[in-house]
Amino acid sequence: MMNESQPKLKYKRILLKFSGEALMGKSQFGIDPSVLDSLARDIAELIHMGVEVGLVLGGGNLFRGKALSQAGVGRVTGDHMGMLATVMNALALRDALERIDLPARIMSAIPMLGVVDPYHRRKAITHLRNGQVVIFAAGTGNPFFTTDTAACLRAIEIGADIVLKATKVDGVYSADPLKNSDAKRYDYLTYKEVLTKGLEVMDSTAICLCQDQGMPLQVFDMAAPKALKRIVTGERVGTIVGANHDQ
């Protein structure tokens, strides 16, 4: 519940996209419990400010389809396995949230009776309004679509104000800043600029979906101090992608 002493919110309902790789921390595989706990605390701070939080997690920390594809596993099978990996991550995050007494629901695009709830748009919105964190799992439920696209789709469906993509760098660059010291970081980009420049913000399907529906994106470094709190109160952190540079 927000009180008068708290800062004014620019974004009341957000969709946070968190990669599976980010959950590994400094490990090469799996889930780092300290990363989960840190993410849970950051989300709790937003909930206590009155922000409604939906999440989509990737699955790259538990499953890497490229290696299996090279071994002959079909793309559809690999994508389904990746969807299951996102459910595993969602279960871990829900547990971390519940350990700090923050109610959370998992809604999966693939029905898993007795494990998680099936995705239902209207119920998801009700949960958000009631102060529960909603974790959307299993992508879109269809192969050939990334979790970035799933995040944008769910954000549009639930009427989120913005999609926040947490990464390991502080925004979008013209080139890989780890390989090119001349790489330029952008403060603002339009959807068209992202597509024409071939910038690695999200896949083109996700960007086009946001462009068609006017859904803004913000790419930021999850390790930046109080990043989420600063963003929801209107501070520019990282790179903003929208219809124009005045987003």
Swiss-Prot record:
GO CC terms of this entry: cytosol
Known pathway: Pyrimidine metabolism; CTP biosynthesis via de novo pathway; UDP from UMP (UMPK route): step 1/1
EC numbers: 2.7.4.22
Superkingdom of this protein's organism: Bacteria
Regulation of protein activity: Inhibited by UTP.
Pfam families: AA_kinase
Chain positions recorded as ATP binding sites: 17-20, 60, 64, 167, 173, 176
Molecular-function annotations in GO: ATP binding; UMP kinase activity
Residues binding UMP: 59, 79, 140-147
Keyword Kinase: yes
InterPro entries associated with the record: AceGlu_kinase-like_sf (IPR036393), Asp/Glu/Uridylate_kinase (IPR001048), Uridylate_kinase (IPR011817), Uridylate_kinase_bac (IPR015963)
Stored CDD domains: AAK_UMPK-PyrH-Ec
Keywords: ATP-binding, Cytoplasm, Kinase, Nucleotide-binding, Pyrimidine biosynthesis, Transferase
Swiss-Prot/TrEMBL GO biological process terms: 'de novo' CTP biosynthetic process; UDP biosynthetic process
Catalytic activity annotation: UMP + ATP = UDP + ADP
SUPFAM superfamilies: Carbamate kinase-like (SSF53633)
Subcellular location: Cytoplasm
Assembly, per entry: Homohexamer.
PANTHER family given in the database record: URIDYLATE KINASE, URIDYLATE KINASE PUMPKIN, CHLOROPLASTIC
Job description of the protein: Catalyzes the reversible phosphorylation of UMP to UDP.
Family label: Belongs to the UMP kinase family.
NCBIfam families: pyrH_bact (TIGR02075)
Protein name: Uridylate kinase
Gene: pyrH
